[in-house]
UniProtKB/Swiss-Prot annotation:
Keyword tags: Cytoplasm, Lyase, Phenylalanine catabolism, Phenylpropanoid metabolism
Quaternary structure, from the entry: Homotetramer.
Protein name: Phenylalanine ammonia-lyase 1
Broad enzyme group: lyase
Cross-link (5-imidazolinone (Ala-Gly)): A224-G226
Function (record text): Catalyzes the non-oxidative deamination of L-phenylalanine to form trans-cinnamic acid and a free ammonium ion. Facilitates the commitment step in phenylpropanoid pathways that produce secondary metabolites such as lignins, coumarins and flavonoids.
Organism this protein belongs to: Pleurotus ostreatus
Catalytic residues identified in the record: Y120
Keyword Cytoplasm carried by entry: yes
Location within or outside the cell: Cytoplasm
UniProt lineage: Eukaryota, Fungi, Dikarya, Basidiomycota, Agaricomycotina
Length: 743
């Protein structure tokens, strides 16, 4: 077994503001031979931050007018998102190399058909019916289309006789999925392995340019011989099947689909002539994983954002919970347990907590008596977050590589080698690579959700949140249950994530005359992953909302504790200066301030008046002990001092209540500004201010402070409406530039 010497450990790149990733090189001690195990444990460093930033910059360039260029080899996930979701322009690489490759493969097919050679899907039946033969390949293609146009869609947009249980148009795929699939299928066909014409790929691009999107059934693909049924609706739109409908016209609302018309009508409206498909082209369009890859690419594009957002919120959660930066110290992660995802995650959070006035950034050793009764470490959701998030980062990096490769592959059968003239029968349409990537991603999304939920629950719970009020109530908790609804809803979200995390691939069924006895269910797995993304974004939105409220309350608490320290000092001097010298006053003031802060932390569930009475009462026993201790040999003086305690307590309670009420009014009325916690934050401040200033979400509690004098929902919108604004900012990418700028 190899022994690693401590003095041979060297860190090649320390943590820095650039959030670079640590690499640890361990040199074996020469007294023992190298171990094959030790020599194999040097995993590649992850850099999800770089992936995220590069993808964001690439997407912005497409949104600014740069076209997505298809050459069969360089299509990125960001490019898929740009064309699918933001209507980015698409251009085909029309270089001689690309067009010649297409021409060669097309010529192979044409020659073999002319020679009467038997080719699967051109002169034979399909799948389990491949024992049939025909010399009419065009009619065979028509039969293929007829067979695959079997999906269930709403037959009309007219009012229904009965209110449906679900949105009828939920039977159709979102347009973004279809646009992404068309893009990926074009990129596969342009590689020149499918025997199709250049004109066919151009015609597909004509539909994208005209913003004509086929209405495609949501369900019906097992993603085994590719996504046959969904792609058949794309093919039907290309050749103008009047029974195939498309989305056309302007988008007038975020709710509901665009105008739905027949493909013939849409093509005529945009002066696009339908294409007559040649032999092999029917199958060439259908027999691929484009829909599975599209949904997977779009899912991963957002999954990267949510994974990094989870890390950012963990840093903000550490601030809101008065946690410690030491959880993310480089020694723990880069030296002691150098899993690459763990290292990168710790690196991100470590840097984000630099300069925070809420988190403990410099830990000090204490005696047993000094930290008695205090939790010595942060709880697991904060302290072990790098170890929990890190493996998800690694799986996500692997999934990104898999799906990027899938988007630049030929997923067809048969395949045509234009150089040798050979036709290959295989199974590149089997999308299990996509399925595995989606199963991993969906499970990771659940784990991230579980972490976020645990942190959020801790933040809302007064027994765990280090002195914050229950349910993050900014006013008396007996009449303010602010975040309790968020707590309950978050439990629902994470439970659903757990259900969605179950694999789809374990439910594969034999299909199509037992020819497709194994299949991938990749599209279904991708759909489930999209649903998981939606649920996780709801959970993250709720947590970010709660964090901002907690940060404001922590800022208020900071002012309150400073004010209480001053009150305690003033009242001790006023009450006991006749009996104590300056040294004793100073010593007892320090003791009292510590007691008051502890009492404040333990009484956060009480209304203000009762709370301050209890806090003041907590000084009674220490006062009696102090005033009857060694400092008082004079019994008469001690007795006189003891008689002042009731009045002293009353003044502390009254002034403490007035201070708390004054601070509540100031914070809730905007007297401390719209973002009162900003001055305590450093690197996470832009995210907090995005919520408070850009989205205009105020600290909650004004209605409660004013006893609902104007009714509920008059002075402020609902909590759900505010969380919805955050969710929309995440969903629509408005928060992404803020996150990018953090790094």
């Amino acid at each position: 077994m190899t022994i690693l010497s401590a003095d041979t450990l060297s860190i090649t790149r320390p943590y820095s503001n650039s959030l670079s990733t640590l690499k640890v090189i361990a040199t074996p001690v020469t007294e023992s031979p190298p171990s094959p195990v030790a020599s194999s444990i040097s995993p590649n460093a992850t850099n999800l931050v770089e992936e995220f930033i590069n993808a964001h910059k690439e997407l912005q360039s497409y949104k600014s007018g740069r076209p997505v260029v298809l050459d069969g080899h360089t299509l990125s996930i960001a490019a898929v998102a740009a064309a699918a979701r933001y209507d980015a322009g698409v251009e085909l690489d029309d270089s001689p190399l690309v067009k010649d490759r297409l021409l060669q493969s097309r010529q192979v097919v044409a020659d073999k058909v002319e020679q009467g050679t038997s080719i699967y899907g051109v002169t034979t039946g399909f799948g389990g019916s491949a024992d049939t033969r025909t010399d009419q390949p065009i009619l065979l293609g028509n039969a293929l289309m007829q067979m695959q146009h079997s999906g269930i869609l709403p037959s009309s947009s007219k009012p229904l006789d009965a209110l449906p249980l679900q949105d009828p148009f939920g039977l159709a795929m979102p347009e973004s999925w279809v646009r992404g699939a068309m893009l990926i299928r074009m990129n596969s066909l342009i590689r020149g392995h499918s025997g199709v014409r250049w004109e066919l790929i151009e015609k597909m691009n004509d539909l994208l340019r005209a913003n004509i999107t086929p209405v495609v059934p949501l369900r019906g693909s097992i993603s085994a011989s590719g996504d046959l049924q969904p792609l058949s609706y794309v093919a039907g739109a290309l050749y103008g099947n009047p029974s195939i409908r498309v989305f056309d016209g302007e988008r007038t609302s975020a709710l509901g689909p665009r105008k739905i018309v027949s493909s013939v009508e849409a093509l005529e409206a945009h002066s696009i002539s339908p294409i007559s498909l040649a032999c092999k082209e029917h199958l060439g369009i259908l027999n691929g994983t484009a829909f599975s890859a599209s949904v997977a690419a779009l899912a991963l594009h957002d999954a990267v954002h949510l994974t990094l957002l989870t890390q950012v919120l963990t840093a903000m959660g550490a601030e809101a919970l008065a946690g410690t930066r030491g959880n993310f110290d480089p020694f723990i992660h880069a030296v002691a347990r150098p899993h690459p995802g763990q290292i990168e995650t710790a690196d991100v959070i470590w840097n984000l907590l630099e300069g925070s006035k809420f988190a403990t950034t410099e830990e000090e050793e204490m005696t047993i008596d000094e930290d008695k009764g205090h939790l010595r470490q942060d709880r697991y959701p904060l302290r072990t977050s790098p170890q929990f998030i890190g493996p998800q980062v690694e799986d996500l990096i692997a999934s990104l590589a898999t799906i990027t490769l899938e988007c630049n592959s030929t997923t067809d059968n048969p395949l045509v080698d234009g150089e040798t003239g050979k036709v290959h029968n295989g199974g590149n349409f089997q999308a299990m690579a996509v399925t595995n990537a989606m199963e991993k991603t969906r499970l990771s999304l659940h784990h991230l959700g579980k972490l976020v939920f645990s942190q959020c629950a801790e933040l809302i719970n007064p027994t765990m949140n280090r002195g914050l009020p229950p349910s993050l109530a900014a006013t008396d908790p007996s009449l303010n249950y602010h975040a309790k609804g968020i707590d309950i809803a978050s439990a629902a979200y994470v439970a659903e994530l757990g259900y969605l995390a179950n694999p789809v691939s374990t439910h594969i069924q034999s299909a199509e005359m037992h020819n497709q006895a194994i299949n991938s269910m990749a599209l279904v797995s991708g759909r489930a992953t999209i649903t998981s993304l939606e649920v996780l974004s709801l959970l993250i939105s709720s947590y970010l909302y709660a964090i901002c409220q907690a940060l404001d309350l922590r800022a208020l608490q900071h002012e309150l504790y400073e004010g209480l320290d001053a009150i305690v000092k003033e009242e001790i001097i006023a009450a006991f200066s006749p009996f104590l010298d300056d040294y004793e006053i100073t010593r007892f003031t320090a003791i009292s301030c510590h007691i008051v802060r502890d009492a404040m932390d333990s009484t956060s569930t009480m209304d203000a008046k009762d709370r301050m009475t209890s806090v003041a009462a907590s000084l009674t026993t220490p006062l009696v002990d102090f005033l009857t201790g060694e400092a008082f040999s004079d019994v008469v003086s001690a007795g006189q001092a003891l008689t002042t305690i009731p009045a002293f307590r009353a003044r502390i309670a009254a002034r403490g209540y007035e201070l708390l009420d004054e601070l509540r009014r100031a914070y809730l009325s905007g007297g401390r500004g719209l973002a009162p916690a900003s001055r305590f934050l450093n690197k996470t401040r832009p995210v907090y201010e995005f919520v408070r200033l850009t989205l205009g979400i105020k600290m909650h509690g004004a209605e409660n402070y004013n006893d609902f004098e104007n009714g509920v929902g008059v002075d402020d919108v609902t909590t759900g409406q505010n969380v919805s604004l955050i969710h929309e900012a995440i969903r629509d990418g408005k928060l992404q530039p803020i996150i990018v700028d953090l790094f």
